[in-house]
Amino acid sequence: MTDPTPAAVDLDLLAEPRLVVEPGLGARVAAVAGPVLQGMGYRLVRIKVSGELGCTVQIMAERPDGTMLVEDCEAISHALSPVLDIADPVERAYRLEISSPGIDRPLVRRSDFERYEGYLVKIEMAVAVGGRKRFRGLLGPLQGDAVLLAREGARDGEDPNSLLPLEDIASANLVLTDELIAESMRRGKIAEREMKRELGVLPPPPPHAKKSDPTKSNAPKAKLPKAKLKAAKKPPPTNTKEHRLAAAERKRLGQTDPTEGD
């Protein structure tokens, strides 16, 4: 079987930089793996180096449309292993793992936040926003260099909407929900069907067929709750019939209204 190659690659998406990157050893591995992945038509999502049961280097990758198949992981492993052996960024024995981002994936690029608008996320900030660093809620739209989030569990009278600067995000992950699972399955089926057509296993679609786009989410746009503001109390009426009768009686008796002349 021919190694799969992502078709009709969006070059802008492919070259889009990550907002969340690794420090130290992870950064050294990313410097080697990133260009190889991009040359193959894939994007680097995350590098994770762990020392449990020996050293494991996990490289999370995806197609520019956010999908990833088992065949993609195999192709990346075959291409990347010899390059890492020569560059030797780890400098000790390790086990290489190539994986997809998973359903509850990390969000590391602007396009990730755009693609998953309307889904439940958890975000940890490197810099506190409004006195807190951890947020969980519905992902809203991007506003310039920040993303809007409708927090869960906001108190009565508290604005649940938080504007989080993208450059200050330490980590952001989707939260597993039924809607997210359904969306992930939909995208996976589209990617698998396209790969089979590339390999000639399936015939091409008829010219009039509507092509599904895995980069477009089926999630409804997030309806961010509005801040709950306490309504100001209306002042009591001052020109009722009772007020006019009382004023006339005071005038007859030669009394003055203490509020007059204010």
Swiss-Prot record:
Any Gene Ontology CC annotation: cytosol
Main subcellular localisation: cytoplasm
Residue numbers spanned by region Disordered: 197-262
InterPro entries per the UniProt record, alphabetical: Ribosome_maturation_RimP, RimP_C, RimP_C_sf, RimP_N, RimP_N_sf
Keyword Cytoplasm: yes
Cytoplasm found in the keyword field: yes
Localization per record: Cytoplasm
Compositionally biased residues, Basic residues: 223-233
One BP term from GO: ribosomal small subunit assembly
Entries under Pfam families matching the protein: DUF150_C, RimP_N
Keyword annotations: Cytoplasm, Ribosome biogenesis
SUPFAM superfamilies in the cross-refs: YhbC-like, C-terminal domain, YhbC-like, N-terminal domain
Bias type Basic and acidic residues, positions: 240-254
Source superkingdom: Bacteria
Function description: Required for maturation of 30S ribosomal subunits.
HAMAP family, per database record: RimP
Similarity comment text for this entry: Belongs to the RimP family.
Name by which UniProt lists this protein: Ribosome maturation factor RimP
Protein's gene: rimP
